């Protein structure tokens, strides 16, 4: 009886999943791991440095830097949800992950991505208020408001992603447990099921368009309003500085969203997209923003750049 019960449970939910890595490129896994590992180290060092500087310097406890602090924490969690396991696959052939471990990774990947998307929207709003309503900046964005915004960003990510776990747990897998990927994501797991995954597809599409899609629209609207304000500045030098800063921000935002939407829509409509391209892009959208954000939002900011140079001179 016990054996039969275990057999039925395994047929419905496999006890483990096998993560293949990048199919067709297993021989190159070691070489592929080098740039990914290098970027991961850069992300850890860059975001860790930003956090250290902002936390230890009380003069930087202002709205813009507090948002940057939130972004750095999110970046550290985002890349750490997938990179350690991916490197374990590439270096140690550690392809196995438990069923619940896979669901946990899936939950954090999507929840942290949604949280970072909300934080990028909050940072765009911060820049809008700073440039378009500078006299009301400190009254609109005080520490209490920023704390509530941060909590709302996290709560929204958790709230919208939690149903993914329920939608996956209702699916039977009929013994299928091999994922052609380096990490667990919602549609990758759902496609292994031996029943209809229409509810998963519909809910995933709804979340992507209504949550992440709305973030993109509102971020774009914020930067359009910022652009209008910048064009009205009397000094050409001030205009160029504002264009340079906003242009860098927009580039990082595009790097964050374009590969993410490519990965999302490839699962649903990209039957002819090579799996290697899909998997590499699916990893890059979780790794490249954590590498770039400290450079664009942090080191590109004069106050933080000065603190970093001061740290370097003190050590030398």
Located regions from the model:
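Transmembrane helical core of 7TM receptor-like proteins
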Residues: 1-316
């Amino acid at each position: 009886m016990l054996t039969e019960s275990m057999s039925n449970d395994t047929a419905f939910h496999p006890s483990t999943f096998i993560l293949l890595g990048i199919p067709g490129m297993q021989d190159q896994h070691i070489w592929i791991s080098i740039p990914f590992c290098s970027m991961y180290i850069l992300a850890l060092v860059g975001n860790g440095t930003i956090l250290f500087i902002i936390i230890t310097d009380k003069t930087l406890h202002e709205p813009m830097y507090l948002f940057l602090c939130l972004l750095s924490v999110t970046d550290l969690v985002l890349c750490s949800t997938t990179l350690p396991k991916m490197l374990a696959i590439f270096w140690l052939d550690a392809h196995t992950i438990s069923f619940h471990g896979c669901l946990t990774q899936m939950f954090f990947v999507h929840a942290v991505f949604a949280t970072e998307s909300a934080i990028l929207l909050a940072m765009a709003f911060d820049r809008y208020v700073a440039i378009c309503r500078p006299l009301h900046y400190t009254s609109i964005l005080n520490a209490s408001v920023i704390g509530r915004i941060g909590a709302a960003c996290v709560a929204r990510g958790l709230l919208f992603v939690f149903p993914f776990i329920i939608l996956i747990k209702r699916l039977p897998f009929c013994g299928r447990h091999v994922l052609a990927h380096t990490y667990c994501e919602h549609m990758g797991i759902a496609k292994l099921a031996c029943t209809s995954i229409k509810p998963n597809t519909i809910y995933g599409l709804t979340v992507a368009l209504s949550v992440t899609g709305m973030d993109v629209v509102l971020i774009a609207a914020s930067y359009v309003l910022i652009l209008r304000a910048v064009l009205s500045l009397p000094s050409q030098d001030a205009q160029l500085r504002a264009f340079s800063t906003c242009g860098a921000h927009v580039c990082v935002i595009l790097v964050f969203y374009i590969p993410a939407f490519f990965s999302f829509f490839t699962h649903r409509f990209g039957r002819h997209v090579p799996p290697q391209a899909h998997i590499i892009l699916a990893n890059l959208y979780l790794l490249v923003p954590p590498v770039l954000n400290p450079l664009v939002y942090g080191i590109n900011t004069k106050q933080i750049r000065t603190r970093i140079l001061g740290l370097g001179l003190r050590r030398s």
